[in-house]
Design a protein with these regions (language model features):
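Short, basic/glycine-rich phosphate-binding loops at helix/coil junctions
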Residues: 6-12, 40, 153-156
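Outer-envelope exported proteins of Gram-negative bacteria
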Residues: 2-4, 43-45, 76-77
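Beta/alpha (TIM)-barrel catalytic core signal, keyed to glycine-rich beta->alpha loops juxtaposed to Asp/Glu
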Residues: 51-235, 240
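Active-site groove signature of glycoside hydrolases
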Residues: 33-54
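A short, structured active-site edge motif that brings together acidic residues
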Residues: 1-12, 102-106
Length: 243
């Protein structure tokens, strides 16, 4: 069991109850531990970069939490490569606990930012990626092959629909079906297995609305993809500039 949480987003109307300042980090961890009913977190993520707070201040606060035994490891989420590099180098300079993980969005349909910007900063430093949205908001499951179901995420969230739902992407996802069928797995399992096989990826974060979806996702960890299968997927999903 790995218990993690995040800090950054506003938790109240209080101007200090947000961001990555030392004050907010120190106050937030105690509230988080109380809510979760635990003495410590395995991983504490800085959920977004905070332009209002120096990276040095944030890094030192995280170092202090580890020294106090409230956190075992700390990491970042959706930070730019230069920010990850700066945090790592600051910690090295002062002998503080280093950031150990970054949490970026990454999937077959969202590749360029991670592969061209983030991995060059994280992989040489041993910073592992804990990927979110590996199914591209459900797009890679095949759910949207024939339109948008009313109760689906794309039916509720226009921004997600605009990001991923294009005729080209629908056709790409359809091309995954024969590959998945040949392997005896679902397209969701194929998409998750692909992410897990990528260099620098330590784990993935998945969402599920039903227990059977969760069980289906977990089975992806047992899937082994050959170099030939990876080549087929790369032919379908050539990296494009992320925006």
């Amino acid at each position: 069991l790995v218990i993690s949480s995040k800090v950054y987003w506003p938790m109240s109307e209080d101007i200090n109850d947000r961001g990555l300042s030392r004050k907010h980090i120190m106050e937030s961890i105690d509230k988080t531990l109380e809510r979760l009913g635990t003495d410590y977190l395995d991983i504490y993520f800085c959920h977004r970069p905070d332009p209002e707070t120096p990276i040095r201040e944030t890094a030192f606060a995280m170092h202090n939490l580890i020294e106090q035994g409230k956190v075992l490891y700390w990491g970042t989420s959706e930070w730019e490569s230069w920010q990850i590099t700066a945090a790592y180098e600051i910690c090295e300079r002062y002998g503080w606990h280093l950031p150990k993980t970054e949490q970026p969005q990454y999937s077959m349909l969202w590749r360029d930012r991670v592969e061209k910007q983030i991995l060059p900063a994280t992989e040489p430093r041993g910073v592992g990626l804990v990927v979110w949205s590996p199914l591209a908001m459900g797009m890679l499951t095949g759910k949207y092959d024939n339109g948008v179901p009313e109760d689906s995420r794309f039916g509720r969230e226009e921004w997600a629909k605009k990001r991923f739902l294009t005729d080209e992407n629908v056709e790409r996802v359809r091309q995954l079906k024969p590959i998945a069928d040949d392997l005896g797995i679902t397209r969701a399992q194929l998409a998750l297995a692909w992410v897990l096989r990528q260099s620098g990826v330590s784990s993935v974060i998945t969402g599920a609305t039903r227990p059977e979806q969760l069980l289906d996702n977990v089975k992806a960890a047992e899937v082994e993809l050959s170099d030939d299968v990876i080549a087929q997927i790369d032919t379908i999903f050539e990296p494009e500039d992320a925006s």
